[in-house]
Amino acid sequence: MIHKLTSEERKTRLEDLPHWTAVAGRDAIQRRLRFADFNEAFGFMTRVAIKAQEMNHHPEWFNVYNRVDITLSTHDADGLTERDIELARFIDGAAAHAQPGA
């Protein structure tokens, strides 16, 4: 069974993820990114998709042109888990050159 993070665990893990914010009304986190153009955004999404498939843990995301909005939560646990934190860290590394989304 997948362990849902406690409030204290969540707080501690999110201290290392300053680009991520809590989703109102859900036990989830989100990040908005903006890239130079669609090709850069799609390349980023492809890298994340490959990692997500390897983890068997898939983000909720939305893409329009150069913007990518990502939400992470573990449906099996009905909330945030270590899997979300691991994927968020990967996403941060893959998006190192992206700008905060508007």
From Swiss-Prot:
Biological process, per Gene Ontology: tetrahydrobiopterin biosynthetic process
CDD domains listed in its UniProt record: PCD_DCoH_subfamily_b
Flavoprotein is among the record's keywords: no
Keyword tags: Lyase
Keyword field contains Lyase: yes
Top enzyme class: lyase
GO molecular function: 4-alpha-hydroxytetrahydrobiopterin dehydratase activity
UniProt similarity note: Belongs to the pterin-4-alpha-carbinolamine dehydratase family.
Record-given protein name: Putative pterin-4-alpha-carbinolamine dehydratase
